Amino acid sequence: MEKGTNTRKKLLSDAFKLFSSNSYENVTFSELEKASGVSRGSIVYYFENKNGLFSEMLKTFVFDNSSVKRVPKPYQHSLIAFYNYFIEILKKEKNKLIELGIKNMNEALFFIEMSALLNISDFRAIASKWHEEEKNIWYNIIQNAVSTNEIRKDIDVKSVADLFEKNIFRCIFYRSILNLWCRHKRITYEL
């Protein structure tokens, strides 16, 4: 059983590497076989088809790994503890991806999410649900911070939660898009 679990994890990691720099259409079963050292039959056994592998890779590497849901409940009672724990999660994820040979996590996620948008019919609904869950967690964290006097009581909790969820963490993603565009146009910028 452990061998099967390891094979499945390896397939997901190898698929992530391939999809992080190639569009969905450009990743073939032959490339998946070559990258993983696993036969097409085994890939189909674990994931049914390329779409199944891609969907599971999305869940594992996009929705589960970079989620504030990964912060344990004891750390969700303080904004500072929550924020620091989440930053550590992101650092660990970045290091794991570097070990996989992926130097820019946000660029990889951008490529994968664009492929998902174009090839997974319910991706918008899944992403929207995930986003709502993330927003609700931030709202609860900020509400806790207000009730424990960690931050002022006269703030608009929803606005501050949106600030954290959108502006702070999404800024990283959009900066990556700017990097891609600038490289494509062969220009440089400084933030």
Residue ranges and their predicted role:
Residues F47, F111-I120:
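Short helix-capping/turn signature of helix-turn-helix
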Residues K50, M57, F61, F86, ...:
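Hydrophobic/aromatic residues within well-ordered alpha-helical segments
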Residues E56, R70-N106, V157-F164:
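Hydrophobic alpha-helical connector segments
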Residues I80, I102-N106, S121-T148, S159:
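Amphipathic alpha-helical packing segments from all-alpha helical-bundle domains
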Residues R124-E132, V146-L191:
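Hydrophobic/aromatic-rich alpha-helical bundle segments in the mid-to-C-terminal region
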